[in-house]
């Protein structure tokens, strides 16, 4: 068996085309969707992510504004800026690029964004809606992963899913989305005993642990669907996932590559969600 590649670049292009059409319709009503990204400090990876978001947004007709603040900015100043953006009627989505410097409380800052402009889907109210299966903004990476299942006709209902990683950005919201779609979900993490025994039970294995090429074929059931959320650099400086692609693609039925898998889908979902927030603001929701 050689795994079918779940092509995030191809699928994200399809989604971006749809987003672009929706932007055109909004502009006919005099509304330009606007996304504001706040970047604190000079983290090189964060700068690349922000640049990619801006470039993608502009290509789709979304107004994207970067606000760059120095590393030593006071938390109060950042909070004041978010308050201003919350009350600005022309802004539809607000995103604070993580990580933030140590002296700033990430939760306090991200929770300050009002739920109606929480384009990342991290506000406790939106997370609560997710767990109660009420529509609202969703964390972009889990939402992008669900799009793979839809596009490639991969059934989720009744399937056993193992998620390795319990972060608030991927693991936990991913579990909620899957439960809402009638999957049976296990979350594994660094304290899980006999990890391979757990992961080998998975019909769908989602890996988000930040350890380069950690998962090999010994962790994967034959015919499983494998979603690799990891982004790591190996010793040669090459971008790799948390899954050993060469090894696992021999046993999996489907697999996402790194790069070109989950990454492009996350940005596509961010754009889609920005436009959805603009649509909701027009509808007065």
UniProtKB/Swiss-Prot annotation:
It catalyses: (6R)-5,10-methylene-5,6,7,8-tetrahydrofolate + NADP(+) = (6R)-5,10-methenyltetrahydrofolate + NADPH; (6R)-5,10-methenyltetrahydrofolate + H2O = (6R)-10-formyltetrahydrofolate + H(+). One of its GO terms (cellular component) is cytosol. CDD domains: NAD_bind_m-THF_DH_Cyclohyd. Pfam families: THF_DHG_CYH, THF_DHG_CYH_C. PROSITE patterns: THF_DHG_CYH_1, THF_DHG_CYH_2. Keywords: Amino-acid biosynthesis, Histidine biosynthesis, Hydrolase, Methionine biosynthesis, Multifunctional enzyme, NADP, One-carbon metabolism, Oxidoreductase, Purine biosynthesis. InterPro entries: Aminoacid_DH-like_N_sf, NAD(P)-bd_dom_sf, THF_DH/CycHdrlase, THF_DH/CycHdrlase_cat_dom, THF_DH/CycHdrlase_CS, THF_DH/CycHdrlase_NAD-bd_dom. Gene3D superfamilies: Leucine Dehydrogenase, chain A, domain 1, NAD(P)-binding Rossmann-like Domain. NADP(+) binds at residues 165-167, 190. Pathway: One-carbon metabolism; tetrahydrofolate interconversion. The keyword Heme does not apply. Its EC number is 1.5.1.5, 3.5.4.9. One of its GO terms (molecular function) is methenyltetrahydrofolate cyclohydrolase activity. Disulfide bonds: none annotated. GO terms for biological process: L-histidine biosynthetic process; methionine biosynthetic process; purine nucleotide biosynthetic process; tetrahydrofolate interconversion. Belongs to the tetrahydrofolate dehydrogenase/cyclohydrolase family. Homodimer. Catalyzes the oxidation of 5,10-methylenetetrahydrofolate to 5,10-methenyltetrahydrofolate and then the hydrolysis of 5,10-methenyltetrahydrofolate to 10-formyltetrahydrofolate. This is Bifunctional protein FolD. It comes from Ligilactobacillus salivarius (strain UCC118) (Lactobacillus salivarius). The gene is folD.
């Amino acid at each position: 068996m050689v795994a079918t590649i779940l092509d995030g670049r191809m699928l994200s292009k399809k989604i971006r085309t749809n987003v672009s059409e929706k932007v055109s319709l909004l502009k006919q009503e005099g509304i330009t969707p606007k996304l504001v990204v706040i970047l604190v400090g000079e983290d090189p990876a964060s700068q690349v992510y922000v640049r990619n978001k801006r470039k993608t947004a502009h290509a789709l007709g979304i107004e994207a504004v970067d606000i760059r603040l120095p590393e030593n900015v006071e938390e109060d100043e950042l909070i004041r800026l978010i308050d201003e953006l919350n009350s600005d009627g022309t802004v539809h989505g607000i995103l604070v690029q993580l990580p933030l410097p140590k002296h700033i409380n990430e939760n306090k800052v991200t929770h300050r964004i009002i739920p109606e402009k929480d384009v990342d889907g991290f506000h406790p109210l939106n997370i609560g809606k997710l767990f109660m299966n009420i529509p609202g903004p969703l964390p972009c990476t889990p939402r992008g992963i669900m799009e793979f299942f839809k596009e490639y006709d991969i059934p989720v209902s009744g399937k056993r899913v193992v998620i390795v990683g319990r972060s608030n950005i991927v693991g936990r919201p991913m579990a909620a989305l899957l439960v809402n779609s009638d999957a049976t979900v296990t979350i594994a993490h660094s304290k899980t005993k006999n990890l391979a025994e757990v992961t080998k039970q998975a019909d769908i294995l989602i890996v988000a642990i930040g350890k380069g090429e950690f998962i090999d074929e010994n962790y994967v059931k034959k015919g499983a669907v494998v979603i690799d959320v990891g982004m790591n650099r190996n010793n040669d400086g090459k971008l790799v996932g948390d899954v050993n692609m060469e090894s696992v693609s021999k046993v999996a039925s489907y697999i996402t590559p790194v790069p070109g898998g989950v990454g492009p889908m996350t940005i596509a979902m961010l754009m889609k969600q920005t436009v959805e927030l603009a649509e909701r603001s027009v509808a007065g929701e």
